[in-house]
């Protein structure tokens, strides 16, 4: 698994926002979204719930997040 994707996941969860995580990491919001979609494809299940108010871990994401 790509360490850049894991770092992006950690930032998105910590900041609660793809936009803020992308700004912090120097990516576009669209690029970070693509990274998260790719990460979810890699692991085979959704790890984030996306909403207008931000992002948070799914129950499955909560189980794997400590490994990040």
For the regions a protein language model found, what residue spans apply to each?
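Core residues of bacterial helix-turn-helix
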Residues: 24-25, 36, 43, 64
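Helix-turn-helix DNA-binding elements, focusing on the entry/boundary residues of the two helices
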Residues: 17-18, 36, 50
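Short alpha-helical "packing" element that flanks the helix-turn-helix/winged-helix DNA-binding module
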Residues: 8-12, 64
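The N-cap/first-turn positions of alpha helices
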Residues: 2-5, 29, 61, 68
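A short LG(V/I)-centered, amphipathic sequence patch enriched
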Residues: 40-57, 62
């Amino acid at each position: 698994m790509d360490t850049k994707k894991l770092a992006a996941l950690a930032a998105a969860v910590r900041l609660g926002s793809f936009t803020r995580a992308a700004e912090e990491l120097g990516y576009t919001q669209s690029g970070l979204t693509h990274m998260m979609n790719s990460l979810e494809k890699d692991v085979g299940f959704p790890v984030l719930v996306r909403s207008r108010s931000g992002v948070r871990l799914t129950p499955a994401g909560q189980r794997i997040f400590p490994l990040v």
